[in-house]
């Protein structure tokens, strides 16, 4: 397991510029989508898979350059500037970065987003 003790300190630093609104995104599957998808799956005897990603944002690369100043927790490096390379919690663009990363992963294993709700992923059966 990786050491994420310093993650919160970087988020709390807040040394960054404003994030454009076009780079923010919060991915939420609609309640109606879940109900309809589960009903269709049940009626057609289809397999349903779901999952949760621990530390999900830190798995996604950060697509922009965000600088922070390191705190006392970093010892001799305190006060030095650093570039954040992962989509940490607290960054406005983290939701969009994670959604793009998840979309790339889902497409790479054969899933496609539903046209009605792009947070529902479907794999065509042949």
Residue ranges and their predicted role:
Residues 1-126:
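Long, low-complexity, charge-biased intrinsically disordered regions
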